[in-house]
Structure formats: structure tokens, C-alpha cells
Amino acid sequence: MELIYRSTRNANETATASQAILKGLANEGGLFVPDSIPALDVSLEDLAKMNYQQVAYEVMKLMFTDFTEEELKHCINSAYDKKFDTPEIAPLVHKAGAYYLELFHGSTIAFKDMALSILPYLLTTSAKKNHVKNEIVILTATSGDTGKAALAGFADVPGTKIIVFYPKHGVSPIQEKQMVTQKGENTFVVGITGNFDDAQTGVKKMFSDEKLASYMDEKGYQFSSANSINIGRLVPQMVYYVYAYTRLVKDGTIQAGDKINVVVPTGNFGNILAAYYAKEMGLPIAKFVCASNDNKVLYDFFTTGTYDRNREFILTTSPSMDILISSNLERLIYKIAGNDAEKNAALMKQLSTEGVYTITDEMKAKLAEFAGGYATEAETSATIKKVYESDSYIMDTHTAVAATVYDKYVKETGDKTPTVIASTASPYKFTRSVMESIDEAYAAKSDFELVDELCKLSGVKVPQAIEDIRTAPVLHDTVCDKEEMESVVKKFLNI
């Protein structure tokens, strides 16, 4: 049976999986969501005997029903290969009283690789299935990690071009160097003088501009997205939660059917939403702990039922979570509104005009399985140092936000359920913040000296992604104001 995807803002706009992947964003700014989430049709015990690629197939076949077995397996096997530095793809590591799901073993050392290594294959397959003749222009806003992972995924992929916008002063030095040294004839990287929300708003505006779309079509182009608003990003992220659970079954930590908790450092809400969708598919998850940094708009939402972006935007050492407009939350709002597109659209309109909305008590009651928490900069830094000293395990700043929030959650609730923490980036991506947390004396060293010091401390080999940018030349130096984003796109495309 074919699974239908529907817009969160218009019940009449539907798409197949491949059409939703191609389009990225629905009309009127809506997001595509599945009409229902099919239950896993393989037992958890059987999944525990499978490798990552096999688990991926069992999850994705249920969500991407218009792909043939051959097409889907080709996408999966092309994505999850030697680009990852471990055959496990996403190893689970038991440290400091929790199970860290290491999602940073791909080519750009952040969790975005888990979905962005497969998205180019899903997208080009979708284009073939739908007889698309236009060149696809991937338009992406990044708070740091998506940009590089999308660039790496789409570099020199025939029939595509990719344009990435990032906040010029809102990413780590390593993140910026990774992006501006990107090779590939079809890649274009632009720093904007605003913050991530400005970049994301600018991208969404171009997506929903019908005049621009028809002009692009005349010139032989069409937009798609590599952001987590694209269902082709979200579904591959469901896989690693299923995989993590089955590893716990495999090593005897839990029995199939036992419940686990998950803690996810959260910005745009895609990663934690993927865990929620995995539960809808039948994965026994009891609690979703949503971890925020000082930009705690989600913590406030889960605590009060009011989403309010009218606040100061704070630059932190966990920049991938420096977000005040959390796009994927809309998919959850739509769900708790009883899949009511009209109700959801009204709330989203309020958000865009007034910057705030409040959900009903009935909707809030459906969020009981979510817990919100946040970590200050000082707490995040202290956690990095504490876990290094107790377990000789070095985590990045985003993972440290999650670990801090998890510790607070356990203290407040006494909940000892086995817990998986999504470890979303390698510490090598945020060396300065990580090393200065361990010892302030490191402040005097350069970024690449710190890379070598981290290698000595952690005993973990310097990832290829970092070696590659040590001496790489800067190939992208365009900077623009947020108002100039559309003209920059047209210039790159020569239209």
C-alpha cells in the first residue's frame, strides 16, 4: 500500500514519498508528513541480528513505499559504505551512566552525515521516477553542520547544484573552514551577516515564492532542500534509533520490548522528531528528553505550552542549536492538533506575525512523553571536563548539553530507565570550546594545535575531515546581507 504524505498547512496537498523528497517544502510553507506511520513488520529480535544497512532498509521501505526494493537498497548501500570510519556506522558507547549513540563517524564528522549521505541518492532516484528534466538546485540554510554534510553529499552529483547559506559570525572556525574549502563545480557557499534564523527564513521565502519558481522553471531549474524540513532527511534519522535499540538487545542490556529513554540535543527539532516517529513505528521509547542550550525556546515551550521566539538570540559554544525558530516542531504541532492542517496553519501564521503562539491544554496533554531541559554555557563546559576526568571520554559541546540535561533529569525524576544520548558531533569539530573546558591553559594555542592536543588526550585519531582542511585553500568567500540572498542565488545560476 502506498503511503501518502500531506502538507501540515493544507489537507488537500498530497505527495508520494519521492514527490515530497523532490519538493522539500510543501506549498504555503507547510511540511510534508506521512498520513500514518506503519508499524515495523520485523521483530525487534530479528532486527538485532541485522547490520546498519539491513535495519535501514526495514525502516525506510515502510516510509518510502514508492521506491522499489532495488532502488532503496542501492541508495542505502551507496550511502553507508567506506565514507564512514567504522563498519558499525553508528556505534553505541557506554560511558558515564548512559549509552552514547555516536552519530559522527561519517565524512564531515557530524550527525548530519547520517541523512545527508543518502539524500543525494534518494533525490536523484526521485527525479528519475518523476521524469524531472530540470536541474535541481539544493537550497540550504545551516547553523554549522548541515552545510558541510550537504555540500559533501551533493558535490559533483550530476543534475544538481547546491547553495549553502550560513551565519558568517555564528559557526565555529572549523565548521567555517570545512565549508569554505569545499570542492565541486556545482557548490556555492555564502556567509550572511545575520543569524541562522535569518538564513532559514530567507531560504523558506525563496521556496514559497511562486514567481521565482516559474522563472527558475523557464531557465531549467527547480529548488529542493537538504534541510531537515525535507522528509528525505527525517526518515533516515529514524533508522539510528531503531539500530541503537537493537544493539542494546543484542548485547543483553535490555530485552526486546523493554523501554528506553532518549536524550537529544535539539535545535531545529528534526533529530528528536525522528526518534518520536521511530516510537510511532513501534520502538519502545518511554521519554524523549529535549535538551536546549541558552536559546531555550523549546524548553520553555514544553514547560509552559507557549512558543515564543521574541527573545534575544544568544551565540553559544553549541552553535548548531542556536535557533529560535525550530522548523520541525511544526510536524509535532500538526500531530497533537489531531492532524488538523487548518489549526496548525493558524498557529504558524501567529508565529510568523506575532512571534508567539500557545497550544491548548488538550494539545499539551499529548506531550506527556516529552521532557524539556537546558544547559548553560558554564554547565556544558563543566560536563565536558567532568566526563573526561571520570571516564576518559571526550564529547563535543552539543553532546555535553544533552549529558548535562540528562543528569538534571535523573536528579529531578529518579528515572533510571536505560538511556541513549544522541552524540551529534565529533569533539574535533569544536576543538577550542572542548579543550578550553578541559583546561583553560589551552586558550593560547591555535585551532590546529588544539586538534593535535585533542588527539593526545583522547587517543582518537584525527579524522580525515580535519586533516583535509588543515592546508586546504579557501574557495568560497561570498558574503551578503539577508536581503540579498535571492540575487546571490540568481547570480550563481547565471539567470
Q: Model-predicted segments: where are they?
A:
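PLP-dependent amino-acid enzyme catalytic core
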Residues: 1-495
